[in-house]
Amino acid sequence: MNAKYDTDQGVGRMLFLGTIGLAVVVGGLMAYGYYYDGKTPSSGTSFHTASPSFSSRYRY
């Protein structure tokens, strides 16, 4: 019973840290697209296509 609880605790902590890490990465990419959108129109085409910014979404 105690080992099962420890396993669940570890999995929950791993998912929690993974979620935080993913949020940090997504936030960093969004900030990069926001600050550098329009400054480097020739680079990062695939990223700008998936960027939430409206100005970069219609740039092809």
Curated annotation (Swiss-Prot):
Keyword RNA-binding belongs to the record: no
Ranges annotated as biased composition (Polar residues): 40-60
Region feature Disordered, mapped onto this chain: 38-60
Transmembrane segments: 14-34
Subcellular location as annotated: Host membrane
Chief place where the protein resides: host cell
Name the UniProt record assigns to this protein: Uncharacterized protein 004R
Membrane topology per record: Single-pass membrane protein
This protein's GO CC annotations: host cell membrane; membrane
Organism: Frog virus 3 (isolate Goorha) (FV-3)
